[in-house]
Amino acid sequence: MPRHADLMERARRVIPGGMYGHQSTARLPASFPQFFSRAEGARMWDADGREFIDYMCGYGPNLFGYGFAKVEAAVDAQRALGDSMTGPGPVMVELAEAMVATVAHADWAMFCKNGTDATSMALLVARAHRGRRKIVLARDTYHGAAAWSTPRPGGVLPEDRAHLIYCRYNDPQSLEDAVREAGDDLAGICVTPFRHETFRHQHLPELEFARLARELCDRHDALLILDEVRAGFRLARDCSWHDLGVEPDLSCWGKAIANGHPLSALLGSERAREAAQKPYLTGSFWFSAVPMAAAVATLKEIRESDYLERTIRTGTALRDGLQQQAASHGFSLRQTGPVQMPQILFEEDDDFRLGYAWVEGALKRGIYLHPFHNMFICAALTEADVRETLEKTDLAFADLRRDAPGLQGPPPQIAATVAAMAGDRR
């Protein structure tokens, strides 16, 4: 029995469903491996030793490449000194200083473990700011796995979302209506830098929407929260809205800030400092020194290297190449979002049968793409990697052209999701 099959059989006995959460392969094509034995740079190897060029980057944490030497050297040095001690190491102050120096709106920093920690902390701080309850969010936007945001209904009570009001992303009138509904009880507006939901096309922020969110928070003495967990430091060396001239009061960070080591952060302006001291915010491993050392080294590389320009260059080459290939095989791709975080969907594929078959064709040739989640470009991805990818995806397109008439859809593992969407991928 292949090692992966054995692992899956054992996992089903001791882990609910065999795996859970966003890294579960339950909704992916059956050939996608669940377990990986190692990773280096832009590549990873599954439990049976198959090698892949990885376009998921661990769902975002891998910014500079798996096992990036400068980060791992900092990790090794700090581990030799201590990690989860009775109090934090001096590196916590160093990291807070580095975050404040890097992100324009930030005057202070607090650290935690996951994106859900950071976004949940942000809501607590916003509510503590003026003792109000209502938070305005964009409908269907993912801000983490807490009960107030998780996309799955199991165990979630109406009370968990009783004080959330929803608007449509990039719709100024909808945002104004939601704020009006909140009235004098508005605590904050929480949005992502751009719209990046699964199964849907991505949408960059419209300037009018971003500016209005800032203006409404100022007008109502509420806090603007920017959820940078997924996009942070992939679009800019600052907050993603900095170039729009819009600064939040609070920003939530995770994934890439420590290049794969477990750390997230809540950054805030002076205006929110007092409110940040009111809730009780803590966790057993929030103050671990090793991930903080990784983050200090990561931030140094963010400030000093050309990583951003490189990811834009390789991301653009991939996007252009795929578009040409799709057209040459008679398909139409819609690639949306920043090239560093591409979402790739087929135009004529409301039930995702084409996308599923295409990524499976790429996978069997050593290219790990995703059929419904946005992907990530890491700085370790080279132009040679992109050329190799395009050689393999061209073959996957050829297979798809041959097999498309006989494909049955939607794939059963996502049939309910497809039915609920009713073809709407906006």
Task: Give the role of each language-model region.
Residues 1-426:
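Conserved N-terminal phosphate-binding loop of PLP-dependent enzymes in the Aspartate aminotransferase
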